[in-house]
């Protein structure tokens, strides 16, 4: 079957666990207590067995043998030959051979062990790519990510993940994402794929400006690939120890997920080093085992869940085993355990993030959220310094790892909650077959009609999704006491009077007393049953351990416009609000998150909890500057709650153009998920209106079923997987049923099996476009919400950060589609920059632009060419004459960042550091991220001045 067909027919399968059985034959004979030992694997096996996870997996130990030709796909023939010769040597000679390498040990059997490890990862990859399995974990050693094409290094002999990538290519994958979580940079993997755009390599590692092993300049953020692979290498280099779950998840949401989503891989490989764990003797970081599992969970949303996790480092054997256990749980479909993010990401982490973004944003427009780093009127990052600093002295003797006594390290114990339940996970579907008794007496084709729920159920049944779930025609009728958890006695009594009215009276009552409501004599009963179904789902979700059950409640009438005292907007009772209060009262849920993605703001829900510190209401909705229903309600980004509830209302109010998948996904990555993680709910309720879907007649947005599914998947990472999705609006029967099916599939599969976009829409042929008004809105939301949620701090860019008076239009447009505006801008852009520089310089010393007097890159300035400098020439790439710069190494002319950014692209591809502006004769150093003025530059400046003005430059 072709890979394209396997993509269309993706389904769930087993999780594979692979062990190389011979791994205990590879030990350090010089240092018996060396941390990279067979005990690592034994502890992992014990953990997986003790918690009964291994029983849920398909365990593989025998693999098709590989030969030297397989190894030579990623390693030079001479390297393979040298290593293979160890099989014929004495241990003494082997030890002498190892001294040629950095931190390598071997025995006469090490080649057999290493080849078994490679065979394991290749076998698992082949099975996953063939749809024989959902995902897999290769529990193998020795690790591999430090081994490059010419040499073993850092405990690594052959590069396992590189071998897995080649197997995936052979099996049909065209794009592979490798995420390296080891605390040490996987420079071997980076080198192998550095000029290969088929592989996006993303590493999060400790660097400390080169002080941490492997002490390489290439481990820093400015190394982003070369040749065709330019922009496909990403180093998130951490320059401080003690980074926590907050730091790592900030990286995931702000940098990795946006980038990986745009890359859209066919296969994901995790270089799973567990030495960033709190308690690791070598790492110095504070990531928790559950933090690891959350990272894995979100990466599993890519590539239709095709993921291979490959063991790398991790030298506290017991804690590493716990982390592996947590990760395999996630691979099996269980939601990760909840984590608390009580602190802001470190300033140095934010610095590392935006430094990386600064060099990648020219290649990936998913980073349009961030303004151009070297544009002075947009350079408002409060704590960022993107200078490349390299502190390591290569003459310093590298300390040996030495022995590590495992019994002296920190440890943790498994609890009963770690043991996998014997029963399978369930998805519960609730509906009310009698909801057709609530209909519009006057208008047969009212958008909120009984056909909505019937069509959804029909689609679920015909697609085969319903039979995989536990479906319930729920007859539970919510009691007065339950309804009054939210609604007033007066409101309930008023609705009870409608049960005896005649049709004419009902129509008159609806028009006179309500806003956008119709009534029948059975409306109250149907509405009670809608509430009852949601409450029943709460009870059954809390009957089991977190994550064992989730639910989709397909009921009407909807609820999120109903306030405590008034039915409104097709809504009688606020189903979700009653459920939130009920969960708190009955099941002691301390914190409840309500996420409302209905295109209309859930004004009723927000009002009910506006002063409540224990219920968070988050809404992504169409706002149109207040002119979209519900008009006149507090639903802007500045409406954040009051009193004890201040900061507990989060509104993402889109205005202007039609929003779609990219905008909703950005809102989730930048706003929803970071805040929701820090809130850390015990229950997640989704007000699932599907009127933002493609072709909805009221919403007029263009969100696809796949994005509704993705949002559901991401929210399922919270509350241990206790999530209930409740139908709200949605008025195109095809759109609503397709969207509900996609959501139900995610709930049932616990995985994203759908592709996020069609092949013809891939980034390579159609770069994703983020609407500028969306970016403006999200910036505004974050600027307000960072006051309440520390996980957002440092990432927000607003004029107020520096007190600069910048108009919104200029602020937005310069960070998005700069190439589009430049072609018609003439020379205006070249004059804007110097004048604005002067304005900033005049504003006082706090904002003065002071060029560096010297920099280490002046040595790269070459003598003038025979033709000297032509200040009136155009860009050599696009032939546009606006804002032209000349490289001071090769004297090539290229346009600046307000045109098509060819000067920056030239720097990134050639590493030529300095350029001279033909507009204002300033010199910019890219690596130093600063202007430079030095006598060594006078010759070039004088030549440009003479060409530009026809006279000698004044001294």
Curated annotation (Swiss-Prot):
Region (Histone deacetylase 2) residue spans:
425-749
Q: Where is this region: Histone deacetylase 1?
A: 15-337
| Span list, region Ubiquitin binding | 896-898, 924-931
Q: Give the main location.
A: nucleus
Cofactor, free-text remark: Binds 3 Zn(2+) ions per subunit.
Instruction: List the InterPro entries hit by this protein, alphabetically.
Output: HDAC_PDAC (IPR050284), His_deacetylse (IPR000286), His_deacetylse_dom (IPR023801), His_deacetylse_dom_sf (IPR037138), Ureohydrolase_dom_sf (IPR023696), Znf_RING/FYVE/PHD (IPR013083), Znf_UBP (IPR001607)
Name the active site residues: 146 (1), 561 (2)
Against SUPFAM superfamilies, the record matches this protein to: Arginase/deacetylase, RING/U-box
Question: Per its UniProt record, what Gene3D superfamilies does this chain match?
Answer: Histone deacetylase domain, Zinc/RING finger domain, C3HC4 (zinc finger)
Q: Zinc finger regions (UBP-type), where?
A: 853-951
Binding of Zn(2+) 3 occurs at 887, 890, 906, 912
E.C. number: 3.5.1.98
Compartments it resides in: Nucleus
Q: Does the keyword Secreted apply?
A: no
Q: Where is this region: Disordered?
A: 815-840
Stored PROSITE patterns: ZF_UBP
Q: Which cofactor does it need?
A: Zn(2+)
Q: Which GO terms describe its cellular component?
A: histone deacetylase complex
Q: What is the designated name of this protein? A: Histone deacetylase 6
